[in-house]
């Protein structure tokens, strides 16, 4: 390998900025004479990335919003591809944001540059033909989960399982008593965390349902307490409106602090999504619920190939965690499913501990080693 190394990274959202900064630290630890170029957020810039434009310009959610910004996104991608081809980095790493980064990777690879994609899109669940595009776009896929690595191996895509950064961040044994003390919760008695999602649409579909479920559980278990971490001020206001006119609940609303809520609780009622991985890593028994618009559900039923929607079940390869979806997600059913886990959730917890240890690979270090090995093979 030459003395100096130029690495291009492109991230499109906050989670990618976190992953990218960790990867940059690990790369510099192994190769001090390194230059970073590309697109990233404040964490990546703090590690020395010269960002060609603000990462926020790529962070768009929702079909209507994407359509409104499509001309700008296409223009920025075209300009970025041209700039990176001229810069001739030793390797280019696209971090998540596949709708933007895979197109960049494909063009750069056609121009003879090495390309890596960090964080697999959900090709194993739906639109599986995207794996053909991925195979053309990147020299190496860095997968966070072992089932993703198996999928890519089966489809002839070079892949490295690197583990998940959260598995190193979250301790193998969380201190429940300390978390309760920090949140002002009593040390004794049982606590259920209600986690209806971080987006307005999710909370709109699941918030009242989760509160109804809590009231049913309280009838059966009068000493129960609840915590609900709100992802933003807007989500807190949404929940507070839902609480108006209800029977009083022993409920503590938190501003953020989802990890504290998980550390403090005994079980979780949770929306399907990345938070289920956090609940798994905190070893908290859970019931997963999800509701979407009727038309969306019918479309997804036709498109989705996976038998499960939650990460714990995908990691287990079986129905370990109850999933109540759409019309099956009623207050009665959710309460009846969650209540036994407050008495004995050991079956879930034993698996959660095993998968935590399997994912605890020091992902940034593993990813850096894989990237440098790819560069050295050139």
From Swiss-Prot:
Keywords: Glycosyltransferase, Lipid A biosynthesis, Lipid biosynthesis, Lipid metabolism, Transferase. Pfam families: LpxB. The keyword Lipid biosynthesis applies. Its EC number is 2.4.1.182. Pathway: Bacterial outer membrane biogenesis; LPS lipid A biosynthesis. It catalyses: a lipid X + a UDP-2-N,3-O-bis[(3R)-3-hydroxyacyl]-alpha-D-glucosamine = a lipid A disaccharide + UDP + H(+). GO terms for cellular component: membrane. It is an enzyme of class 2 (transferase). The keyword Transit peptide does not apply. InterPro entries: Glyco_trans_19. One of its GO terms (biological process) is lipid A biosynthetic process. One of its GO terms (molecular function) is lipid-A-disaccharide synthase activity. Condensation of UDP-2,3-diacylglucosamine and 2,3-diacylglucosamine-1-phosphate to form lipid A disaccharide, a precursor of lipid A, a phosphorylated glycolipid that anchors the lipopolysaccharide to the outer membrane of the cell. Belongs to the LpxB family. This is Lipid-A-disaccharide synthase. It comes from Pseudomonas aeruginosa (strain UCBPP-PA14). The gene is lpxB.
